[in-house]
C-alpha cells in the first residue's frame, strides 16, 4: 500500500486501486498502469437515492438507506453481462437494467456482473433489488443504485472478457459439472401425465431410435404441493406405487432405469406471498426428498408457482416492499441444499435445473427458461454472466428451432401444458430432429470437455462472438451466431453469417470458405441452420448411442479439419460422481499442425485415472477435406493404403474416400503409454485442402459492391497501418480474387504476388524495418516464388505476410495505438484538469514525443484538442439543461468565472446565453 497526500494506492500483480482521500472516489488501473475505470462522482451510501419521475426512486422505491455509485465510460467501451435480460442486446451500453425478477419483463437470472471491453469487471455484493443504468441516461456514465442496503462491490481487472470471466469464477466459485447424461437430451412430460403416459413417452424415443436420457415430471406428480415443511408422496392415482414394495425394477422408475432413462421431479420454489417475509427454509428439509432419491430419482426441476412471464407483469403497489425482499438468492439456497444433501445420500451428482437464479447459481444448478423468440440470446447473455449451463425450451416445430435447440449447453424439450414430442412432428421434421439428436450424442465427449473448461476457467460452452473474437469489429456486433466450444460456429434463426478471419468448413456440405466474409447461406434440406467448423479444429465423437454410457468409451472418433494449427484437451471421468473434483479424471492433449506438405496429428498420453476407466481404446482418426495423401506414417512407420469396408480394416492401414475427401485410420492406444502417438500425412499435390467451388467462393466474399483494385489496395494499406486485421485481410482476399481471375499463367500469378509485396515493402519501411525483417520466414519470400507454386500458395503467403506486419505493429506499440490510449484518457477524464506531462507520464512516454505524434495524428495540438473536447462537452451539458456551475465542474474547471471567459472566447457567447 502506498500513501500519498492526495490518494492511497493498493496494488496486486494484475491491477492497482487508487482512492482519492478527499472524495473517496476510486480509480482502477491495469498492470501496465493504464486507467481502466474510475468513479466520476463520490459514492453515496445511507442517504437515500435520487428521486425518479413522480417523486419515487426508479430503482427500488423511496428510502433513506439506499446507495448510488457511478463510473465513467470511455468512448468505444462495450459493456456485457448483467444476466438474462429479455429484449436487450448482448452489449448492454445504452440500456437500463433492473436486477430483480418483477420489472415488467421476463427475467430468469439477473446477475449484477458487469464486464467491460476495456479490461475491468464489477460485481455488486447485495441480495437487494438494484439497478444498472449503463450509459442510458448519460452516455458516458454507468450508474448503479439501490433503494436499500449498503454499497458493496468487487472490482477486478483482466486482459479481456475471457480473463474477466475467469476472475469472476475465482471470486464466486466454479460452475458445477453436470452428470454426463445431462448434456444429452432432456424431455419434460405434460403436467397431466400419468406413470403410463410417462413410460409411453420414454419408449417412443427408444422405438424411433432417438437418443434421450432424462425424463422430467412437473410438480403435479405429488399428492399435495410441496411446501418444505412436511412429507409428500406420489399422487395416489396417477403415480401409484405399492407401499409394500416401493423399490425395484418392477416400479415405473425401475422400468425407466432399465431403458436407460433418468428421472427428475419438479418442485415449486417457496413463495410465502407476504410482503417483506423472508423465505427461510426449515432445517433438514432435504429429509423430505430422501425417499424419492432412494427410489432412483436423479434430479429436481425447481419451478416457480406461476410462469415467469406472468410473474414479471404482476402489478406491484408503489409502497410494496416485497419487490425488495423477494430474496434474489432463494433458488441458489434451495439448489445448494439439494446438491449437498443428494451428494451425502448417494455420492452422485444430481441434475438440478431452475428457471430463476442469481450470483453463484452456477455452482449448484443449471438454468432454463420457457420458449423465447430469440432463445440463443438468453444462453449467450448468461454465458457472459458466469452461468455456462443455460437452456431454453426447444422450438420443436421449426427446423431453425431444432437447430438452435440442440446447440445449447444442454438440450431440453418441454411438453408442460402442451403436446410436444418429436414423434408428433411431420416426417421431415422428425427426420431432422433425429439427425440432430444423434449428432448431439456423438458430440458428448466434445461438449463434456467444454463443460470442464467452463468449470475451470469460466469460459462458457456457448460463447458469444465478442468473447472469442474481441479484436474483430465486425464479429463483436454479431448477435445471431456464436461459437459452440472452440470448433463450431452456429448461426441461429438467420441465413446471414459472418465468418471471421481464417478458413472454415461447412459442416453439412464439406465446402471450404475463407474469412473474413459475409455469407448469404442456403440451408441444405437435411439441416436446420448454418453450422461451420473452424480450420484446425479437433472434435472427438462417441459412436451412436441411445443414451449416455450405453457403450464403453473404448472407441472414439477423432475428426480433424486441416487449414491451421489446433489443439484440444479431452477431459474424461466417470460422469456421475464428484470424483472429478478430487482428481479422479483423465486428461488427453491432442494437437495438429498444418505445414506446407505435411499435416500432423499428435495424440498425447492420458494423464490421470478414474474408476472403471478403459485400459485400452482405439482412435478412429478422420481427417477432412484432403486430397488423397501420398503417404501416411504413424510414429515414423509408414502405413499402407487399404480399400473396402472400414469396419474391420487390417492393422497399420489407412483408407481414403474420394467422394467425401476424408482419410480414415484406426490407431490403437493403451493407458500406460508414456509418449505421444504421432501421425504424419504427406500431401500429394500443391494443395493442402480441397478447393471450394466457384459458386461457394463467390458467396464467401464480403458484399462490398464493385471496387477497383486501387480502392482495395488503399483498404489494405489502411488495415495494415491501423492494425485492423479484418479490414486488411478482407480487402486482400477481394483484391486477390480479382487478380487471380485475370491470371493466365504462373508468371501472371507471380507478377500479382510481387505487386502486393511492393505495397508490403512500403508499409514495412514506414515502420522503420525491411519486409524481410518482419516476414522473412515466409517460404515464398525465401524461395523467390518457384514455378511449382499455385495461386492458392501465393494468396496464403500474402495473407500470412499481412498478418505478420499487423502483429509487428501491435508488438511495437505503433503511433495509432499510443494516440488512441491518450484520447481514451482524455475522454474518460474530461471532468479533470488534463496536462500533457501527466498523460505522457502515465503512458511512459516523453512529453515532447507525445506532443509531436499527437499533432501528426490528430491535426491539433494536445492543448487545442483537450479544449475542443471540453468546450463541446460543456455545450452539450448546457443545452441539456445543466447549470453553468455544473457544466464547469463536469468539464474540469474549478473556477466558474474562468470557465465563463474560456467558453465565451471559444463559442462567442456566454454559457448563460448558450443555456437560454
In which residue ranges do the predicted regions lie?
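Inter-domain helical "communication" segments and dimerization helices
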Residues: 687, 692-834, 838-846, 860
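Catalytic-domain carbohydrate-binding cleft regions of carbohydrate-active enzymes
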Residues: 33-528
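Sequence-specific DNA-binding recognition helix
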Residues: 839-843, 847-848, 854, 880-915
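Accessory, solvent-exposed terminal regions and/or long lumenal/extracellular loops of proteins
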Residues: 535-637, 657-693
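Solvent-exposed beta-hairpin/edge-strand motifs
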Residues: 497-509, 621-646
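Terminal helix-turn-helix DNA-binding modules in bacterial transcription factors
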Residues: 823-828, 837, 856-894, 916
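Beta-strand-rich N-terminal accessory domains
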Residues: 1-43, 498-501, 518
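Short, well-ordered beta-strand segments enriched in hydrophobic/aromatic residues
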Residues: 8-14, 489-491, 598-609
Amino acid at each position: 500500500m502506498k500513501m500519498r497526500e492526495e490518494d492511497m494506492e493498493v496494488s496486486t500483480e494484475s491491477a492497482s486501486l487508487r482512492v482519492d482521500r478527499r472524495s473517496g472516489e476510486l480509480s482502477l488501473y491495469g498492470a501496465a498502469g493504464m486507467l481502466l475505470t474510475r468513479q466520476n462522482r463520490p459514492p453515496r451510501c445511507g442517504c437515500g437515492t435520487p428521486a425518479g419521475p413522480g417523486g419515487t426512486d426508479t430503482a427500488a422505491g423511496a428510502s433513506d438507506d439506499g446507495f448510488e455509485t457511478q463510473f465513467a465510460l470511455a468512448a468505444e467501451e462495450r459493456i456485457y453481462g448483467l444476466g438474462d435480460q429479455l429484449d436487450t442486446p448482448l452489449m448492454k451500453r445504452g440500456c437500463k437494467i433492473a436486477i430483480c425478477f418483477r420489472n415488467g419483463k421476463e427475467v430468469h437470472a439477473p446477475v449484477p456482473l458487469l464486464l467491460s471491453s476495456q479490461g475491468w469487471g464489477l460485481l455488486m455484493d447485495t441480495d437487494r433489488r438494484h439497478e444498472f443504468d449503463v450509459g442510458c441516461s448519460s452516455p458516458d456514465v454507468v450508474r448503479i443504485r439501490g433503494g436499500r442496503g449498503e454499497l458493496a462491490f468487487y472490482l477486478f481487472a483482466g486482459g479481456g472478457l475471457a480473463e474477466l470471466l475467469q476472475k469472476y469464477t475465482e471470486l464466486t466459485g466454479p460452475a458445477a459439472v453436470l452428470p454426463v447424461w445431462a448434456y444429452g437430451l432432456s424431455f419434460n412430460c405434460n403436467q397431466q401425465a400419468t406413470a403410463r403416459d410417462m413410460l409411453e413417452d420414454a419408449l417412443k424415443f427408444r422405438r424411433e431410435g432417438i437418443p434421450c436420457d432424462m425424463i422430467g415430471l412437473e410438480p403435479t406428480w405429488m399428492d399435495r404441493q410441496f411446501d418444505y415443511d412436511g412429507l409428500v408422496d406420489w399422487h395416489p392415482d396417477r403415480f401409484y406405487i405399492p407401499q409394500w414394495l416401493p423399490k425395484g425394477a418392477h416400479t415405473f422408475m425401475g422400468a425407466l432405469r432399465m431403458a436407460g432413462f433418468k428421472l427428475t421431479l419438479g418442485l415449486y420454489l417457496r413463495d410465502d406471498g407476504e410482503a417483506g417475509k423472508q423465505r427461510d427454509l426449515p432445517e433438514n428439509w432435504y429429509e423430505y426428498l430422501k425417499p424419492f432419491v432412494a427410489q432412483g430419482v436423479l434430479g429436481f426441476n425447481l419451478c416457480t408457482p406461476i410462469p415467469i412471464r406472468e410473474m414479471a407483469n404482476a402489478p406491484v403497489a408503489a409502497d410494496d416492499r416485497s419487490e425488495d425482499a423477494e430474496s434474489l438468492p432463494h433458488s441458489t439456497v434451495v439448489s445448494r441444499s439439494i446438491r449437498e444433501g443428494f451428494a451425502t445420500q448417494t455420492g452422485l451428482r444430481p441434475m438440478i435445473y431452475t428457471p430463476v437464479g442469481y450470483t453463484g447459481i452456477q455452482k449448484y444448478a443449471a438454468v432454463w427458461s420457457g420458449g423465447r423468440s430469440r432463445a440463443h440470446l438468453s444462453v449467450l447473455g448468461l454465458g457472459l454472466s458466469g452461468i455456462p449451463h443455460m437452456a431454453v425450451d426447444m422450438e420443436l416445430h421449426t427446423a431453425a428451432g431444432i437447430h438452435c435447440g440442440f446447440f445449447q449447453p444442454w438440450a431440453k424439450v418441454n411438453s408442460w401444458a402442451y403436446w410436444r414430442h418429436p414423434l408428433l412432428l411431420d416426417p421431415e421434421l422428425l427426420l431432422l430432429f433425429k439427425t440432430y439428436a444423434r449428432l448431439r450424442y456423438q458430440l458428448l465427449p466434445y461438449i463434456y470437455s467444454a463443460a470442464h473448461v467452463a468449470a475451470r476457467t469460466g469460459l462458457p460452452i456457448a460463447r458469444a462472438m465478442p468473447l472469442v473474437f474481441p479484436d474483430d469489429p465486425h464479429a463483436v456486433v454479431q448477435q445471431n451466431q456464436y461459437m459452440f466450444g472452440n470448433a463450431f460456429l452456429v448461426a441461429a434463426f438467420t441465413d446471414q453469417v459472418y465468418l471471421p478471419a481464417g478458413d472454415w468448413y461447412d459442416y453439412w456440405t464439406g465446402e471450404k470458405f475463407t474469412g473474413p466474409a459475409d455469407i448469404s447461406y442456403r440451408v441444405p434440406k437435411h439441416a436446420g441452420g448454418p453450422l461451420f467448423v473452424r480450420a484446425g479444429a479437433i472434435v472427438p465423437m462417441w459412436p451412436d448411442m441411445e443414451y449416455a454410457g450405453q457403450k464403453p468409451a473404448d472407441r472414439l472418433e477423432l475428426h480433424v479439419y486441416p487449414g491451421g494449427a489446433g489443439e484440444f484437451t479431452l477431459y474424461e471421468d466417470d460422469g456421475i460422481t464428484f470424483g472429478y473434483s478430487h482428481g479422479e479424471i483423465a486428461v488427453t492433449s491432442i494437437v495438429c499442425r498444418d505445414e506446407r506438405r505435411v499435416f500432423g496429428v499428435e495424440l498425447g498420453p492420458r494423464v490421470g485415472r478414474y474408476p472403471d476407466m478403459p485400459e485400452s481404446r482405439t482412435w478412429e482418426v478422420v481427417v477432412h477435406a484432403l486430397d488423397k495423401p501420398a503417404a501416411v506414417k504413424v510414429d515414423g512407420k509408414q502405413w499402407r493404403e487399404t480399400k473396402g469396408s472400414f469396419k474391420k480394416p487390417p492393422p497399420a492401414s489407412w483408407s481414403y474416400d474420394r467422394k467425401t475427401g476424408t482419410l480414415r485410420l484406426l490407431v490403437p492406444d493403451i493407458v500406460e503409454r508414456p509418449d505421444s502417438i504421432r501421425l504424419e500425412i504427406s500431401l500429394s499435390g500443391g494443395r493442402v485442402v480441397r478447393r471450394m467451388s466457384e459458386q461457394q467462393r463467390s458467396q464467401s466474399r464480403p458484399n462490398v459492391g464493385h471496387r477497383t483494385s486501387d480502392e482495395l489496395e488503399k483498404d489494405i494499406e489502411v488495415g495494415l497501418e491501423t492494425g485492423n486485421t479484418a479490414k486488411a485481410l478482407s480487402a486482400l482476399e477481394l483484391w486477390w480474387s480479382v487478380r487471380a481471375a485475370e491470371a493466365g499463367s504462373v508468371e501472371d500469378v507471380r507478377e500479382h504476388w510481387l505487386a502486393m509485396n511492393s505495397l508490403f515493402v512500403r508499409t514495412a519501411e514506414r515502420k522503420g524495418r525491411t519486409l524481410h525483417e518482419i516476414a522473412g520466414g515466409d517460404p515464398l519470400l525465401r524461395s523467390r516464388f518457384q514455378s511449382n507454386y499455385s495461386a492458392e500458395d501465393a494468396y496464403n503467403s500474402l495473407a500470412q505476410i499481412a498478418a505478420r506486419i499487423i502483429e509487428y505493429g501491435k508488438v511495437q506499440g505503433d503511433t495509432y495505438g499510443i494516440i488512441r490510449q491518450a484520447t481514451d484518457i482524455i475522454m474518460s477524464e474530461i471532468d479533470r484538469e488534463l496536462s500533457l506531462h501527466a498523460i505522457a507520464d502515465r503512458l511512459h512516454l516523453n512529453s515532447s514525443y507525445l506532443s509531436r505524434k499527437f499533432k501528426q495524428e490528430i491535426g491539433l495540438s494536445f492543448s487545442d484538442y483537450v479544449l475542443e473536447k471540453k468546450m463541446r462537452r460543456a455545450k452539450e451539458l448546457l443545452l441539456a439543461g445543466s447549470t453553468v456551475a455544473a457544466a464547469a465542474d463536469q468539464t474540469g474547471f474549478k473556477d466558474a468565472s474562468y470557465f465563463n471567459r474560456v467558453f465565451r472566447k471559444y463559442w462567442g457567447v456566454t454559457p448563460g446565453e448558450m443555456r437560454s
